[in-house]
Amino acid sequence: MKHFTTLIVVFVAIKAYLVALALVVPRQYDTSSTLLFPNNRFLSRLVIWDSVFFVSSAERSHLYEHEWAFSWMWSRALGLAGSRDAIAYTAIAVSSLSHLLAALMLRKLTESVFHNKRFAETTALMYILSPAGIFLVAGYTESLFALLSFTGLYLRQRGQYPLAGAVLGASCLLRGNGLLWGIPFLFDLASAIKHNQFNRGVSVVIGGSLVGAVFLYTQYLPWSIFCPERDEWCNYYIPSIYGYVQQRYWNVGFLRYWTANNIPNFLFAAPVLYLMYQSMSTNPSLVPFYTVHAIMGLACVFMWHVQIITRISTCLPTLYWYMAKLAQGYNGHYVVRYIFVWITFQVVMWGAYLPPA
């Protein structure tokens, strides 16, 4: 109970601090949020960047092709809230609450993996202090995606593969990289085959298939809407609208981000990338986790907008295990100081509509 109380106090303090900073940052040059909420300063300062797309799409569903870069399911779910203001408040509330629940689920997952209650509690606390900062407040999908990820991984850890697959499959409705959670099932299947565990193998196949099936549905849905009338990506060998709009509208692709003007973004990402690199482990029982960890890190460096690593890494328990290990060490206070300085800098830049975002 004492640890839970500590988590709640730190959680509320961090959220209040980030929101207060966002409200006092000098007004950004982009007016999208002001046009959406001309008479609501709170929402006009928090619903910016990607949140603008989520709220707009929630009001009228996905209308334009480029909006499919943002979760269709998240927008549809938010749309149930009704009015524009209600949608925005709901997004912020769900994002914030999911952050807390994700920390609690990460604690359960960590204790299940390491059988160390104190380490699990430290991991949960580090997750509350996450470098993702304002992105776990402002109505993005990261918090809920992380909650589903940790829940699914916990169920997998307990051998409940079909249920784990259903939960991790649901994460694919929020973010395409949820497909990567199918990788641990491949390791589990190999283990089941090696040890002649037929029933376990069948259970693993069902769970992994659910992840793949939901991901394929997220690709089929826009294809059924736009194709075959929309040439171009409809005729690709793998007709994925997400990959197409990311490449066309956001210039995502191999080494496309490696330009001189993006050097600051690489510097923004460097601390988290360094922590991810240092945290790598060859412990056989952890290899499935670290395989996903490594793929996401490499994809961010070579394929995606590298600065997003600070927020999309929130689904990686491996990163927070390492941060918890550092926090329990002799110089653990340096980790906490780094996070506090970083999230302060981050929210000021984000609120002024400047990278990293």
From Swiss-Prot:
**Which pathway does the record list?**
Glycolipid biosynthesis; glycosylphosphatidylinositol-anchor biosynthesis
Query: Which EC class does it fall in?
Result: transferase
- Major location category of this protein: endoplasmic reticulum
Keyword Kinase attributed: no
What keywords were assigned to this record? Endoplasmic reticulum, Glycosyltransferase, GPI-anchor biosynthesis, Membrane, Transferase, Transmembrane, Transmembrane helix
According to its UniProt entry, the protein's GO biological process terms are: GPI anchor biosynthetic process
**Which locations, inside or outside the cell, does it occupy?**
Endoplasmic reticulum membrane
Gene Ontology cellular component list: endoplasmic reticulum membrane; mannosyltransferase complex
Q: Transmembrane ranges?
A: 6-26, 86-106, 128-148, 167-187, 201-221, 257-277, 286-306, 334-354
Q: What is its EC number?
A: 2.4.1.-
What membrane topology is given? Multi-pass membrane protein
Q: Does the keyword Membrane apply?
A: yes
GO molecular function terms attached to this record: alpha-1,6-mannosyltransferase activity; glycolipid mannosyltransferase activity; mannosyltransferase activity
What family does the entry list?
A: Belongs to the PIGV family.
Q: What function does the entry list?
A: Mannosyltransferase involved in glycosylphosphatidylinositol-anchor biosynthesis. Transfers the second mannose to the glycosylphosphatidylinositol during GPI precursor assembly.
Task: From the Swiss-Prot or TrEMBL record, give the protein name.
Answer: GPI mannosyltransferase 2
| Organism annotation | Yarrowia lipolytica (strain CLIB 122 / E 150)
Lineage, broadest ranks: Eukaryota, Fungi, Dikarya, Ascomycota, Saccharomycotina
Q: Which gene encodes it?
A: GPI18
